[in-house]
């Protein structure tokens, strides 16, 4: 199995990385394990992740991996190259070295601002960070070649910038295979491996000692190895491919190579084909091929069970090697080489992790089984003790005379004062003559005032008198061999311990008491064993979970996020996408780039209220009232109404009734908008939001949902066409039904939601900073030409009178206040002149009566404090910096510059590709998947609670004091408890990251309500 990159692999990977990642900034650098790292790059609307395993691989990946604790090496790299722009990805000549260049300064080539990340893929590998002068700043491992060459911090790395392969031009400098070069190469191999005798025959001195010790003959070098050593840029697989293409054995000894012209020509043609492969891998995208082996697995326990096949990845290449094709390996083709390599190594990682998890599970099962066996042994020993005690008691009851005789015999000897050793000798000598002595076991237990005797086993006693007689020979044999021990049941006799102070039946009663004690102990042990087993099982599960959590190498297929997930978003109950900005910059971005004709602009007259955009499916169709109400709920939830628990109304207007230009023609600041229509207020809404899960479906399930959606739209369209016919509207077969319906919808929409006439009405300025009175209002009224002339005449007269009162020049003034007044007047004159020029340029030549000028009074409210100032002063303050820059420009140049600036702030229509992504999201995200649907991921969402009626996983969110992160994690844990542990949905929820869980929530403090109203559980504050 291939495990590390060749020079050819690095060339293909470098070419694709140059095509995709160059120009991106390094967002962050992560540890995956001791030698594997993850680099995350990003630029506008694009993110890339690169996995680097020192000595083995480097490629783009679509899989998410959990990060390991931060190491000192990664900390050093973050310090130097984080947030820097990647300016080059190159291969160092034909070596297995990949160099990432992070440029800076003039033309990204200033050595003082340039860094190199060098990745070595030979031997044990290494990762080094160099500055612009090739000085090592940090490295993964210190390497010592000899006394004079050491790779360590502070040393200089041998990096020739001219040897970096950055494009096809650099690749063309590598020499191709020619007939002359091939002849020189073959001659060199023939000379180096001339004949076996020149290399393998021993010297004369060695021949003298050959009689005592045989000399080991080295194995001849193969032709493939000899070529690989001298042609490293081709790689081992490509060289073998060339040899097989020229019908040469790769294992052919190099020393036996003959100068056959036919073979040389075939080999030259094969190497020229290899040169074309080398040229192709530098022109991205490069196709990748994975070669796999089908392995059959049989069930040994059930041979009749059919064989199961599993696919094992064996090799990967940017071409199809002839040796693998001839070996009948299964080939999988990928459009890019990064995808190919990512699939190969990710599959291997997944197999390793699966095996590791399987081993942990097997160990846990063995521990649990061992605990069960231990408890079973304890219970079995107690049960055996009960049976033995009962058997001993029965034996005593069946032989009371013998038992009494034994007790009397021993007590009589003790009463005589005989020594204990003498008693044992006496009993031993009388065993053959006395049945009483024969039944006694030696040695005695007189220290316990007890003696062990052998009594007939009740289970083996027959009713006949013969079988009940005691055999002296058997007793003698058992006594001599000492094989019968206390408590051991033989086939005919059983050993019973008798208390010398008790009679026969008293000893039997004692055995029954022991049996009863064993029974009680068994009951208690069984109860304790059950608890101990559960405790052991719980501990094993905790250890298993802890070890699984500690395993930082989980591989998860990354979910491609939708473009709208960077905003606040939800899908309404009628299937409309609703978007909201997170801050003023996002409000601006949302308005300028993600709005289309027919969309609805929703907002609230409260501070911090987000700008909400309802995306319309058809420009002429009206938005359902429920969707508007739900969008208003999101606008209120993102404002101060959530914290203050205020119930007010949001409002909406059409998107074409919103502008970035103030009535004076000035461009409003970021996040502020001019509303040029009457606001349509929505009913007051209770602040109840919801947090739930949308399940992402696979392609087939999404197609089914799309077909159902289109079918419903067709039914609705046919219904509208029927209404048209009933109203007398003619619809021919040549008409486009959808166009007619859209026209009718537009007519209905214009009747019900017509744009109010702004002539003589108020123009509202909407911004993030809105006070108690709501948005700013600038009243614009009609001004006739006569009134304008009189106003200009009055201003000139006033200016003349003021000029007569004031000093003519600054030199004539004496006090500082007068000088300041003169400067202010000069500045005001310049601004008034610019204002007059602007007004005159805005007056049409044919219709001067329709021009509207703002009145002088406006109101700016910030942080709840109102300060009335004139609209003219607002304009003057905004023009201070521009007036200075436009002094040297002509009137036409100033008009062109202003027109260009205004055009840059105009709303742009959202591209069609994003519309298709919206419809794809609506079709692929479902709150309640059907039985035939296949779920591939989980997407958290935050929406009004009345928009989540179809959700199978949801919680209620209300204003409170709880933290967002903790509440969101509790919600995910609550959802997981409701699902089976082995279900895919639970696994998808478990794989959600904290960022994905918290990102949809648009409030800062909250209270989660779990379950139904009858069984609620509030999140901890």
Swiss-Prot record:
Polar residues composition bias: residue spans: 746-761, 839-856
Region (Disordered): 457-484, 746-801, 832-905
GO biological process, one term: CAT tailing
Keyword Coiled coil: yes
Coiled coil, from the record: 348-388, 507-546, 698-727
Compositionally biased intervals (Basic and acidic residues): 876-905
Positions where Phosphoserine occurs in the chain: 478
InterPro entries for the chain: NFACT-C (IPR021846), NFACT_RNA-bd (IPR008532), RQC_Subunit_NEMF (IPR051608)
GO molecular function: ribosomal large subunit binding; tRNA binding
GO CC terms in record: cytoplasm; cytosol; RQC complex
Listed Acidic residues bias regions: 462-480
Function: Key component of the ribosome quality control complex (RQC), a ribosome-associated complex that mediates the extraction of incompletely synthesized nascent chains from stalled ribosomes as well as their ubiquitin-mediated proteasomal degradation. Thereby, frees 60S subunit ribosomes from the stalled translation complex and prevents the accumulation of nascent polypeptide chains that are potentially toxic for the cell.
Subunit and interaction comment: Component of the ribosome quality control complex (RQC), composed of the E3 ubiquitin ligase rkr1/ltn1, rqc1 and mtr1/rqc2, as well as cdc48 and its ubiquitin-binding cofactors associated with the 60S ribosomal subunit. RQC2 binds to the 40S-binding surface of tRNAs.
Protein's name in the database: Ribosome quality control complex subunit 2
Originating organism: Schizosaccharomyces pombe (strain 972 / ATCC 24843)
Top-level taxonomy: Eukaryota, Fungi, Dikarya, Ascomycota, Taphrinomycotina
Protein encoded by which gene: mtr1
């Amino acid at each position: 199995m291939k495990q590390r990159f060749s020079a050819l692999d690095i060339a293909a990977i470098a070419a694709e990385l140059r095509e995709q990642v160059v120009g991106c900034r390094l967002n962050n650098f992560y540890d995956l394990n001791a030698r594997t790292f993850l680099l995350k790059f990003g630029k506008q609307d694009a993110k890339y992740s690169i996995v680097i395993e020192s000595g083995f691989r480097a490629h783009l990946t679509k899989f998410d991996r959990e990060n390991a604790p931060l190491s000192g090496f990664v900390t050093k790299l973050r310090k130097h190259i984080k947030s820097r722009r990647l300016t080059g990805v190159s291969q160092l000549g034909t070596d297995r070295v990949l160099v990432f260049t992070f440029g800076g300064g003039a033309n990204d080539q200033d050595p003082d601002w340039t860094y190199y990340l060098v990745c070595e893929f030979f031997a044990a590998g290494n990762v080094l960070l160099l500055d612009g002068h090739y000085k090592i700043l940090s490295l993964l491992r210190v390497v010592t070649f000899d006394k004079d060459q050491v790779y360590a911090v502070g040393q200089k790395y041998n990096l020739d910038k001219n040897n970096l392969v950055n494009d096809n031009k650099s690749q063309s400098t590598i020499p191709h295979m020619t007939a002359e070069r091939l002849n020189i190469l073959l001659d060199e191999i023939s000379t180096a491996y001339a004949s076996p005798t020149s290399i393998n025959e021993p010297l004369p001195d060695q021949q003298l000692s050959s009689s005592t010790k045989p000399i080991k003959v080295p194995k001849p070098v193969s032709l493939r190895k000899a070529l690989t050593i001298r042609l490293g840029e081709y790689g081992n697989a490509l060289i073998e491919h060339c040899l097989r293409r020229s019908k040469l054995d790769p294992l052919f000894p190099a020393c036996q190579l003959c100068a056959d012209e036919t073979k040389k020509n075939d080999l030259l043609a094969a190497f020229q084909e290899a040169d074309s492969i080398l040229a192709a891998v530098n022109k991205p995208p490069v196709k990748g091929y994975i070669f796999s082996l089908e392995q059959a697995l049989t069930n040994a326990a059930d041979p009749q069970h059919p064989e199961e096949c599993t696919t094992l990845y064996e090799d990967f290449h940017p071409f199809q090697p002839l040796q693998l094709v001839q070996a009948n390996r299964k080939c999988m083709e990928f459009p890019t080489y990064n995808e190919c390599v990512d699939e190969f190594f990710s599959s291997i990682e997944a197999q390793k992790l699966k095996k590791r998890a399987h081993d942990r599970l097997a160990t846990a099962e063995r521990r649990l089984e061992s605990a069960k066996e231990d408890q079973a042994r304890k219970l079995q020993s107690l049960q055996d003790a009960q049976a033995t005690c009962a058997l001993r008691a029965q034996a005593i009851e069946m032989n009371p005379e013998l038992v009494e005789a034994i007790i009397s015999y021993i007590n009589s000897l003790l009463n005589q004062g005989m020594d204990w050793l003498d008693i044992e000798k006496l009993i031993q000598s009388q065993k053959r003559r006395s049945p009483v002595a024969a039944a006694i076991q030696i040695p005695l237990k007189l220290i316990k005032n007890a003696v062990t005797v052998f009594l007939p086993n009740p289970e083996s006693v027959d009713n006949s008198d013969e079988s009940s007689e005691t055999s002296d020979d058997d007793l003698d044999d058992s006594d001599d061999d000492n094989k019968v021990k206390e408590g051991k049941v033989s086939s005919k006799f059983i050993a019973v311990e008798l208390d010398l102070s008790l009679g026969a039946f008293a000893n039997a009663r004692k055995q029954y008491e022991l049996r009863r004690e064993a029974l009680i102990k068994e009951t208690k042990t069984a109860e304790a064993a059950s608890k101990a087993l559960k405790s052991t099982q719980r501990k094993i599960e905790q250890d298993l979970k802890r070890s699984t959590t500690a395993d930082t190498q989980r591989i998860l297929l990354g979910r491609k996020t939708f473009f709208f997930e960077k905003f606040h978003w939800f899908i309404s109950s009628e299937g409309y996408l609703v978007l909201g900005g997170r801050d003023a910059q996002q409000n601006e971005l949302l308005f300028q780039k993600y709005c289309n004709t027919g969309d609805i602009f929703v907002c609230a007259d409260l501070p911090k209220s987000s700008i909400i955009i309802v995306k319309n499916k058809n420009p002429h169709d009206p938005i359902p009232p429920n969707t508007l109400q739900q969008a208003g709920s999101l606008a209120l939830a993102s404002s101060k109404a959530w914290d203050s628990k205020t119930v007010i109304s949001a409002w909406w207007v059409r998107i074409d009734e919103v502008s970035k230009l103030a009535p004076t023609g000035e461009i409003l600041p970021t996040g502020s908008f001019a509303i040029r229509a009457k606001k349509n207020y929505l009913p007051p809404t209770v602040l109840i939001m919801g947090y739930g899960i949308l399940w992402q479906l696979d392609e087939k399930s999404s197609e089914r949902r799309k077909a159902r959606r289109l079918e419903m739209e067709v039914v609705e369209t046919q219904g509208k066409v029927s209404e048209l016919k009933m109203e007398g509207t003619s619809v021919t077969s040549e008409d486009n039904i959808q166009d007619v319906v859209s026209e009718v919808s537009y007519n209905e929409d214009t009747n019900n939601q017509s744009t109010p006439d702004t002539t003589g009405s108020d123009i509202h300025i909407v911004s993030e900073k809105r006070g108690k009175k709501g948005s700013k209002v600038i009243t614009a009224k009609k001004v006739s030409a006569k009134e304008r002339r009189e106003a200009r005449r009055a201003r000139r007269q006033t200016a003349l009178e003021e000029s007569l009162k004031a000093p003519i020049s600054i030199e004539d003034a004496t006090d500082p206040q007068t000088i300041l007044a003169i400067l202010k007047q000069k500045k005001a004159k310049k601004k008034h002149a610019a204002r007059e020029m602007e007004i005159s340029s805005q007056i049409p030549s044919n219709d001067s009566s329709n021009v509207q000028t703002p009145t002088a009074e406006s109101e700016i409210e910030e942080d709840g404090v109102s300060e009335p100032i004139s609209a003219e002063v607002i304009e003057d303050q905004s023009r201070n910096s521009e007036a200075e820059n436009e002094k040297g420009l002509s009137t036409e140049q100033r008009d062109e510059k202003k027109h260009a600036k205004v055009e840059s702030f105009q709303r742009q229509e959202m591209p069609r590709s994003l519309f298709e992504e919206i419809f794809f999201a609506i079709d692929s995200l479902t709150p309640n998947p059907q039985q035939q649907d296949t779920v591939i991921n989980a997407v958290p969402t935050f929406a009004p609670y009345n928009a989540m009626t179809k959700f199978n996983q949801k919680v209620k969110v209300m204003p409170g004091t709880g933290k967002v992160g903790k509440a969101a994690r509790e919600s995910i844990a609550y959802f997981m408890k409701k699902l089976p542990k082995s279900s895919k949905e639970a696994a998808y929820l478990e794989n959600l990251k904290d960022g994905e869980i918290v990102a949809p929530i648009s409030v800062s403090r909250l209270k989660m309500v779990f379950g139904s109203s009858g069984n609620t559980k509030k999140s901890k504050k």
